Structure formats: C-alpha cells, structure tokens
From Swiss-Prot:
CDD domains: nuc_hydro_IU_UC_XIUA. This is Pyrimidine-specific ribonucleoside hydrolase RihA. SUPFAM superfamilies: Nucleoside hydrolase. Belongs to the IUNH family. RihA subfamily. The active site is at H240. The keyword Hydrolase applies. PROSITE patterns: IUNH. It comes from Salmonella paratyphi B (strain ATCC BAA-1250 / SPB7). One of its GO terms (biological process) is nucleobase-containing small molecule interconversion. InterPro entries: I/U_nuclsd_hydro_CS, Inosine/uridine_hydrolase_dom, IUNH, Pyrim_hydro_RihA, Ribo_hydro-like. Signal peptide: none annotated. GO terms for molecular function: purine nucleosidase activity; uridine nucleosidase activity.
Length: 311
C-alpha cells in the first residue's frame, strides 16, 4: 500500500524537484499539497505549486494556499536564490486549475480526518502551516504518522552563521513542530550540503530526454549559478528539499541519529538555530531523527531513475 503524504512547500527550485520526485514514485500517495511563504511571496509559491502540477498533469491533487507571514515575524524571502518568480529558468506552463477555496490548514485537517491511516507530512519550507495545524487541531495529532522537514543544521547556517533559512523564517513555528511529541525527521544542511548535484548530473538528467527531465535540468541550470559563489566551497548545488522525499523512498542511502532538537527563538546571534543535543548533554529524550550523511551517488541515481517515469 502506498504511503499517504501531504506536502507543504514553498517552490523554489528544490521544492519543485521534490514534487517531481514524489509524483514519480508509486510508493507514495500525495493526498494534498499546500503552499507556504518562504522562497518567494505566498502568492508566487502557490502559483508555482499550480504551475508544477499543471506541468506534471496532476490537477486531481487538492491544493491550498497557506499563511501569508510567519507566526510572529515579518516575512523574509529568498529571491536572491530562486529569482523573481521563485522558479526562474525554464518556461513553465500557466496554471490550468485553481486552488481550493479554503486554507492550507483546513485542507491538511480535512485530509487527515478522512484518511484511513496516519499520514506523513513532508514540509520543505518554513513550518508555519504545520505549526498552525498542530495548534488548532490537537485532536488530529494521532492521525499524523511523522513530520519530515527540510530545515535546520547541527553546525553551520546558510542564512545566518547559525541558522538555516527555513527555520530562520519562522523559528517559533519550528519549535512548535519539534516539541509537538509527533515523530520528526530532520533533513538539515548537514545532509543536504552533501546531496550536491554536479554539472555532469544535470547533463545526465537532460539526456534522459523527456519533457520533465528537461525542465528539471533547466531548473538546476539556474539553481547552480547561485551556488558557484566561492564562499560555499561547493562542487555543485545542494538539492535540499528532495532529501525529504528520497528518505521516504530509500532510507538506506541516509545515515541518521536520534537526538533532541530545540529551536532558538531569542538569541542575539543564534535566532533560528536548531540546537541538536548530539552528546546527550541536556538529559532530554530524543524528539527527532536527524539525517547526518547521504550516499550522494545513490541519491543522484534515484533522481535519474524516477525522471524516466515521465517518458
């Protein structure tokens, strides 16, 4: 039986590729997709979800737009990474269908309520929508199997010296998620910076030769440029968000540890930092499965294999 999932995302090049991977995988049943503000403004990320589903010919999947700003802060976006549209690079179709009239939280709650089995929530943007769901529907917590997030880091940040972007945008929401008591799986920068796509990998995807693999290659062409900056020390571009979907499909290519994670919401220098108790110093019981390593070649091979689904 396919694993039921809800995807909450803020497309974003890597979010878009995570959607491509999920919808090419019969092991997963994508029951709903919700959009969050983050990589771009809420209007643009919602539009990008609809554009991607139009491209992938999946207007059957319910879509709803989420919170327009973080729980307690003004919105920060990453247009320097993802461009004016949020998905700059390829020519994507205009949406062929409309989102649901309700909110992301309403669609998530309805999906959980109607599911015969617990649902995995995959969140590849800020945690605002998920936190709102958890706070407003405590009766549905038991319907959530786990929450798999792209966010955080044990060590270095990518938006501030201490903080990864998704967590920095809404640290209060992330803290709600980590302390919810629901199993959390964290794909942070420790693993996503190892899941780099090299120039040769982009050409491998392009050579698959179907319309979707071509779009993915063009998305990566644009995404690659930002990561050429010498300050990162990268060979390629880290493909953050697809690590969440890849872990659901092939957990054996990832190395994980069970640890307690908290989110700093007040720090002068460390706001948005995910504090990972790696050496069990707090006495707190682990609340997260933290990804720390990945078989990069296995990750690339999985993407290439699933892109052939669209032939």
């Amino acid at each position: 039986m396919a694993l039921p999932i809800i995807i909450d995302c803020d497309p974003g090049h890597d979010d878009a590729i995570a959607l491509v991977l999920a919808l090419a995988s019969p092991e997963l049943e994508v029951k709903a997709i919700t959009s969050s503000a983050g990589n771009q403004t809420p209007e643009k990320t919602l539009r990008n979800v609809l554009r991607m589903l139009t491209l992938l010919k999946r207007p059957d999947i319910p879509v709803a737009g989420g919170a327009v700003k973080p729980l307690m802060r003004e919105l920060i976006i990453a247009d320097n990474v993802h461009g004016e549209s949020g998905l700059d690079g390829p020519a994507l179709p205009e949406p062929s269908f409309a989102p649901q009239s309700g909110t992301a939280v309403e669609l998530m709650a309805k999906t959980l309520r109607e599911s015969a089995q617990p649902v995995t929530i995959v969140s590849t943007g800020p945690q605002t929508n998920v936190a709102l769901l958890l706070n407003s529907h405590p009766e549905l917590h038991t319907k959530i199997a786990r929450i798999v997030i792209m966010g955080g880091a044990m060590a270095l940040g990518n938006w501030t010296p201490a903080a990864e972007f998704n967590i920095y945008v809404d640290p209060e929401a992330a803290e709600i998620v980590f302390q919810s008591g629901i199993p959390v799986v964290m794909a942070g920068l420790d693993v996503t910076h190892k899941a780099q796509i090299h120039a040769a990998d982009i050409e491998r995807f392009r050579d698959i030769g179907n319309p979707i693999s071509t779009i993915v290659a063009e998305l990566l062409d644009f995404f690659f440029e930002y990561h050429k900056d010498e300050k990162w020390g990268f060979v390629g571009a880290p493909l953050h968000d697809p690590c969440t979907i890849a872990w659901l499909l092939k957990p054996e290519i990832f190395t994980t540890v069970e640890r307690w994670v908290g989110v700093e919401t007040q720090g002068k220098y460390t706001q948005g930092m995910t504090v990972v108790d790696y050496y069990f110093l707090t006495g707190n019981k682990p609340n997260a499965t933290v990804m720390v390593d990945v078989d990069r070649q296995g990750f690339v091979d999985l993407l290439a294999e699933r892109l052939q689904y669209y032939a």
